[in-house]
Regions:
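Alpha/beta-hydrolase-fold serine-hydrolase catalytic core, especially in secreted/extracellular enzymes
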Residues: 6, 300, 309-312, 316-388
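N-terminal cap/lid segment of alpha/beta-hydrolase-fold proteins
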Residues: 44-103
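Short, surface-exposed "cap/lid" segments of acyl-processing enzymes
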Residues: 92, 99-130
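Conserved alpha/beta-hydrolase
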Residues: 127-147
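Alpha/beta-hydrolase active-site loop
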Residues: 151-172
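Primarily recognizes the serine-hydrolase "nucleophile elbow" in alpha/beta-hydrolase
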Residues: 167-226
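Short beta-strand/loop motif that positions the catalytic acidic residue
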Residues: 266, 272-274, 278
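Conserved alpha/beta-hydrolase "acid-adjacent" motif
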Residues: 279-286
Length: 388
């Protein structure tokens, strides 16, 4: 009997010791798998002096406000064209131009974000409004045969957009030296490649730009989404474990697009626009990074506007849904800014503040570095699951 009890006690002791050892190993492994960084609060807020987003320049000849064509000044004409790309590919495009406007006028090429692709379904209201203020616009289709959820090549996309840029620069009535670009969201990454390749662009407008890499932006967006959904902190703390994992083996190399490298090419007059209801973008941090990069490149002609609007600068919902109206001042501000900078307005030539609008409130910081822990690749996890 004693021997049986003894064996039971020994077995229990061994089992307990083994359980403790396994617990310690699993705890150590869990700690090793956790990145040494977390999402931090954002505190470097931008202070605005006025909620008025109006943009006006000073006429150097008179000292008064520069008079430029206003929205609705011209009737517009729409022309559907085909743009030839490399490899025998083509995309459709729409040119909108002001009728009876003076020659040598400004022009603007539009670059799609991730949510749009067809020229017939995107930017129609913005592009037509610009045209009515004397600015010729070109909206091409996004090339989609090499654009998927797993593969996106922003450098190649910039090369494709350059074909449309050349057509626009040669369009009748357009001044080549007064032609610039307008990009939204994901398209702003492509825009910075285009500004590097074409530093002679007259201007660049970046609306709702992520600024940081896709991996870094997604960390911020996921944190804000889970916070809004009421997720506990323990769940939100899992985000760095996921977003730090390498994705190249799965084809998601574009998540690590070198945004910092390309934003140094913003040497031309720059307009940055954000909707303060956009929680997916680093609305204050991104603006500071862009202004810093432009300034370091010798460009101080940077205007920043914040609107009481969503990611698409539309009102009526914080979410991106079809059919919403644009923020009522938005297109007017775009046109006034383009007409001013193409008239020669420099950093010291503005009659209105260079930073204005609705006060933003970015709550968390998009991490600028996301080093992984022990497990470095999403492919390792996928492979382990497959084996199991």
């Amino acid at each position: 009997m004693r021997s049986i009890v003894k064996r039971i006690l020994v077995t229990c002791a061994a089992t307990t010791a083994l359980a403790l050892l396994l617990t310690m190993v699993l705890c150590a492994l869990g700690n090793a798998m956790a990145p040494k960084w977390q999402v931090e609060p954002f505190t470097d807020h931008i202070t605005l002096t006025t909620t008025n987003t109006a943009i006006q320049a000073v006429d150097p000849a008179t000292g008064a406000v520069l008079k430029t064509p206003q929205e609705g000044a011209y009737r517009t004409k729409e022309t559907h064209i085909t743009v030839a790309l490399d490899g025998g590919k083509t995309v459709n495009a729409i040119v909108r131009e002001p009728l009876d406007a003076p020659a040598d006028r400004p022009a603007c090429l539009f670059l799609h974000g991730s949510g749009t692709g067809k020229s017939s379904e995107a930017f129609g209201d913005v592009a037509n409004a610009m045209a009515s203020a004397g600015i010729t616009t070109l909206v091409p289709d996004k090339r989609l045969d090499n654009y998927t959820m797993l593969h996106r090549d922003y450098v190649s996309s910039a090369h494709d957009y350059a074909k449309s840029l050349e057509i626009l620069r040669k369009w009748p009535g357009v001044s080549r030296s007064e032609t610039g670009i307008y990009a939204e969201s994901e398209g702003t990454w492509i825009a910075t490649v285009l500004t590097q390749q074409h530093p002679d662009l007259a201007f660049a407008i970046l609306t709702s730009p992520p600024v940081v890499s896709g991996r870094q932006q997604m960390t911020l967006a996921a944190t804000n989404y889970l916070t809004a959904a009421g997720a506990p902190d323990a769940v939100k703390q899992l985000i760095p474990r996921i977003t730090s994992l390498g994705t190249q083996r799965m084809g998601l190399a574009y998540a690590d697009f070198d945004a910092a490298k390309y934003r140094r090419s913003l040497t031309m007059p720059l307009l940055i626009n954000y909707g303060v209801k956009d929680t997916a973008m680093p609305v204050e941090q991104g603006a500071r990074l862009l202004i810093k990069a432009a300034n370091q490149a010798g460009n101080t002609n940077v205007t920043l506007r914040y609107y009481d609007a969503n990611h698409q600068l539309r009102t009526g919902s914080n979410q991106t849904v079809p059919g919403l109206p644009l923020e009522p001042h938005y297109t007017h501000d775009l046109e006034d800014w383009i007409n001013a900078v193409t008239s020669g307005t420099g950093a010291n030539g503005w009659a209105t503040p260079m930073i204005a609008g609705t006060q933003p409130n970015q709550t968390v910081t998009a991490p600028l570095k996301t080093p992984p822990a022990l497990v470095k690749s999403m492919g390792v996890i996928v492979g382990a699951i497959a084996v199991c």
